[in-house]
Amino acid sequence: MDPSDAHLGHAQFGDTPDSGDAKTSSRVPLPEGTLPVGIGLLIAGVTSYLFLKVAKVALGSDEAVQPIASLWIATFALAPGFFLPLEQELARTLAHRRAIGQGGQPVVARVRTLGIGLAGIVTLAALAASPLIVSGYFDGDWVLMLALILAFSAYAPAHLSRGIASGNGRFRAYAIVMGADGAVRIVLCAALAILGVKTVGLYGFVVALSPLPGVLYVRARGALRTEPGPESTWAEVTPNLGWLLLGSVFAAALVNAGPLAATLLADGSVGQKRLVTRFTYGVLLARIPLFLFQAVQAALLPRLSRLAARNEIAEFRSGFMRLMKLVLLVGVVGTAGAFLLGPLVIEKFYDAELSRKTMAMLALGSALYMVALAIAQAVIALRGHALVALGWGIGAVTFVVVTWLSSDELFRRVELGLVASSITALITFALALRSRLRSGDLPSGQSVMEAINNMPLET
């Protein structure tokens, strides 16, 4: 899966109509939008695995693909971290206005201004640091630096478009924006390969521009239209945005930290570039449990949202424990599967080699991250946004320290950093959850929606 989307939550789980007393039936119908968004998510996930395969066929070797893989990872470490919270808050606010019969045009204008400002600040920071980024990460290639800036900017309208589509219940448009990104990336990459293009920079621009065709298509069809309404205030669209943004930036960086760190720590030789690319293959394969986690959410979170809205806390806790058991099961199966089958899959699909130990460590880190993410969502549901930001921040610091001090072996130090960072984040969230429960904090429908949407991953 891509360096990271998991926005089945944007199908507005909490808005599923109640069809009777919860005690009469434990079954919850699939929320509106689950099917189209699920299809878009599937397309995005499958094409993400195919992208590096097509790029390798086009460029001829693992070491030739490494700059493109590094650009791709960097893009999804930056864009979701900064823009997913805007998408989430825009969708939440528009859905609320739609429910009370108010137009959302002023809300979109507010969030658009915020997005432009955020994109501008991050772009200026990237430009200021560009000499260091180019020399330390892109091996002196300024074209890839330009592609990174363009890619980051291109994902701003993509995320805002998804927020508008989701908040207005236009889930087909949401799925088109999501799925078209991966589909366009594959088609353009394959076209360059057929033409025999070997220039890495052109493949970089494919990564940069792939989000835009889907946005332009749904805009042309009027799916991003909003109605006039009462003036929007900053308080309406940013009640928890600061903490959500901070936590999202740390979480997105952490889920992509493995390939990022491996690229920075490699010595730049052909052999090391080959190893970094193969490591990236392993990271993508190890994320399959995270992809399955989204399916688990789709099945259980609609009921949790309804229970929270009714203040049925005992049932909410029971449902959350069921979710945690499934998450743990997915994590165990994923780790065992990576150990037993991971090297074979890497060999057959990517024509590369990766050890069982490396695959198992990567899958373990991914599984622990998944558990931490599930607990973090529960903390957000209990209005612990600041605690979640703190937990992801502690995880990020742990990754840096452990990767720096633990070993001199490239893969081992990064693997240990990933596992240790997920463990510290998990422990922090578990302590925060216990604290929020003991203090008597109760979830609300809105806080659960924020929790459901809090998936800082992109496929």
Question: What function would you assign to each model-found segment?
Answer:
Residues 2-7, 14, 28-87, 127, ...:
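Signature of the first transmembrane helix
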Residues 4-5, 9, 14-30, 172-176, ...:
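Interhelical loop/hinge segments that connect adjacent transmembrane helices in multipass membrane
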Residues 29-44, 70-71, 80-131, 312-335:
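Membrane-water interface segments that mark the loop-to-transmembrane alpha-helix transition
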Residues 32-52, 180-181, 185, 203-218, ...:
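Transmembrane helical elements of multi-pass membrane transporters/channels
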Residues 54-57, 121-139, 333-351:
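Short membrane-interface helical motifs at transmembrane helix boundaries
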Residues 83-99, 282-286, 290-311, 381:
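Helix-loop junctions and terminal segments of transmembrane helices
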Residues 142-149, 175-224, 394-398, 411-436:
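Hydrophobic alpha-helical transmembrane segments
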Residues 154-176, 358-360, 364-391:
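Membrane-interface junctions at transmembrane-helix termini in multi-pass inner-membrane proteins
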